[in-house]
């Protein structure tokens, strides 16, 4: 739900994301092994996530929007890592990043089939699928000198064995902000008991009126930072007009947070 005082900020959020999406749709995209294509993929996902955050906020679900803000931060760190690789002309980093989705899909399929065979070792369909899967798996385990498919961790492509280590090497190190965002993702004590909207006593079982300040500020910050570093390399993706609008959004979201 949106109360009267939220309307200007929500409108600025919508306007900023729409301007960002419109600029990106004008960029020529070819599916190829380039940093340009890699950045387009991550940034486009970031804008789609921003649309989801807007939808959750306008319908009164700030805590769920906050959880998605963590995805924006993770996207920002990935973009920063890729752009640093571009500066170094690191073709191996790029290739690992582009191979990662295929490898992660193989890992998921392997775990699913392993589970099926564990419960029914005579499952002929699972056996035949596993045999075909093994051929694809060997191609990547040999290429990257891994013993097993499950040796590929989620952020292996970055050269670090965890997101935290990758973030610490970026210009946007993981700190208290990421911890606050994680509290809205993990079902821990904070996630269960602390709500962004605390205007009403009791446990909310539906949409709420308040709690939009923090998600708006996080979203504005991560979008502005991403657009800024992308503009340094690919100004056509994030033109100055978009950066100016995101800067305004970030400044006003910061002021809105202090109210």
Q: What residues fall within each predicted segment?
A:
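Acidic/His-rich structured neighborhood in mature extracellular/periplasmic domains
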Residues: 82, 93-103
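Predominantly late transmembrane helices and immediately cytosolic-facing juxtamembrane segments
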Residues: 83-88
């Amino acid at each position: 739900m949106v109360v009267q005082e939220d309307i200007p900020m929500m409108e600025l959020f919508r306007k900023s994301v729409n301007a960002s999406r419109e600029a990106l749709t004008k960029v020529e995209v070819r599916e190829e092994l380039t940093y340009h294509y890699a950045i387009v993929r991550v940034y486009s996902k970031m804008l789609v996530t921003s649309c989801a955050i807007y939808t959750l906020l306008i319908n009164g679900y700030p805590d769920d929007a906050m959880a998605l803000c963590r995805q924006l931060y993770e996207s920002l760190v990935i973009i920063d890592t890729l752009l640093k690789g571009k500066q170094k002309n690191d073709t191996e980093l790029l290739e690992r990043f582009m191979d990662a989705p295929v490898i992660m899909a193989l890992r998921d399929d392997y775990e699913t089939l392993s589970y099926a065979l564990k419960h029914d070792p005579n499952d002929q369909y699972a056996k035949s699928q596993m045999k075909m899967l093994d051929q694809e798996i060997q191609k990547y385990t040999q290429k990257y000198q891994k013993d097993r498919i499950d040796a590929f961790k989620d952020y292996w492509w970055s050269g670090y064995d965890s997101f935290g280590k990758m973030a610490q090497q970026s210009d946007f190190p993981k700190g208290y902000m990421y911890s606050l965002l994680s509290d809205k993702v993990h079902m821990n004590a904070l996630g269960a008991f602390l709500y962004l909207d605390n205007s009403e006593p009791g446990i909310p079982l539906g949409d709420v009126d308040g709690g939009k300040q923090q998600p708006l500020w996080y979203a504005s910050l991560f979008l502005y930072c991403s657009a800024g570093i992308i503009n340094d390399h690919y100004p056509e993706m994030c033109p100055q007009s978009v950066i100016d609008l995101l800067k305004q959004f970030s400044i006003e979201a910061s002021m809105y947070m202090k109210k």
